Amino acid sequence: MSSIPRQRPRRRAALAATAMAACLALTATACNGDEDADAGAQPSEEASTGDDQLQDLIDNLPFEFDVEAWMDGAWADWDEETWLREVGDFVNPIIDGLWDQERMGEAEDPEQSIDDDQIDEDQNAPEADDPMADRGITDPEPVAVEAEAVPTPYTENGAPIGKVFFDSPEGPMVCSGTVVKDPNAPGQSNLVATAGHCVHAGTGGGWYRNLSFVPAYNNNGLGAAEIESAAYEDVAPYGVWWADYVSTTQYWIDNGTESGGDGAHGDFAILSVAPENGSGLSLEETVGAALDINFDAPAVSGLGAVTLYGFPAADPYDGALMYSCVDYPGRLSIDATMPVMYWAGCTMTGGASGGPWLRTNENDEPELISVNSIGPLESTWLAGPRLDEEARGVLDYVSAEVSGG
């Protein structure tokens, strides 16, 4: 079973799972050999985009936007005419205290299941050395792998991973997400990777609201019944971080649906976040780590073992704990024109959506190659998109908007 150890100066920890080993540094550059990275993190020049950028976003909206009315509850009006949908049309004013322990506990998982009838397996598909040759192929269904609880405290064993909270027309919802590196802000990233369906409704709607990220949620692994009355710092040890910018793939926006596999090949998103109560430090400096994303991963035959993480919330889980699964992924193709998806045995359920798929690269370091997207009603496997140039464009777009470049 994999864990993500907290990294301290001059200490190299390992993520061990089956044949998989990697360093998930909690300091910004320790995996790159900078052993003094935690000797005294300096505040980033811009830990948040601030009021000026919010006003710029508001000024560019296609209708008049009343911030005070929004914060007083107008955000709960999901009228189609004011439900922002397009890339760049996103506002998310911080509402202090909205995501308290009680409301976090009420958040439901967004169902993203797929019917077996949508999957056409090829029992004899040959392996490929080129990712392009993986397109259009679906390997036999993976054997279920029982998810295992990640050791606590999560600040030591999984700090870059947390929960993504948001409001949809159905009420408060929850997914999972991961702190990832910002190419334009090395060591000071405020970026989080998650699934597209955790930020945008796809073809039937627009951007979700009150998007926030809580890294190392429920740090000490309290039971679900204990969380509501627990100390806030036990539930959100690094605080609540509100999205100030977000983007997903155009493929998800144009094709994504609430259930089934439509749009799943592009089910990826990046959030830029800022702390509800500003600390002057970036998210990466605060939690101590950010992961690389590999947008040019090998063909499935060369991936090796992968570890899937998330906070499953649907039965038999309750969303309180972080879990992981380790498996060797196969190929899944719903749209043969798109890069292949990966699927792997895993019993995690809804709520794990957006959680990372990690593999060990040739430098013996962890990298994110996908995020949890869809699974069957029986919860025996999970699938995630191969991250390609369109996904890279999502990261680059958000990075350029918030960090320059």
Predicted regions and their residues:
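N-terminal export and membrane-targeting signals
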Residues: 1-21
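C-terminal motif of bacterial Sec signal peptides marking the signal peptidase cleavage site
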Residues: 26-30
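Protease-domain processing segments flanking chymotrypsin-fold serine proteases, especially trypsin-like
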Residues: 33-186
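Conserved catalytic-core segment of clan PA serine endopeptidases
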Residues: 149-159, 165-168, 180-183, 200, ...
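Cytochrome P450 catalytic-core helices
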Residues: 194
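Catalytic nucleophile loop of clan PA
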Residues: 347-371
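C-terminal cap/linker of serine protease catalytic domains
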Residues: 369, 378-405
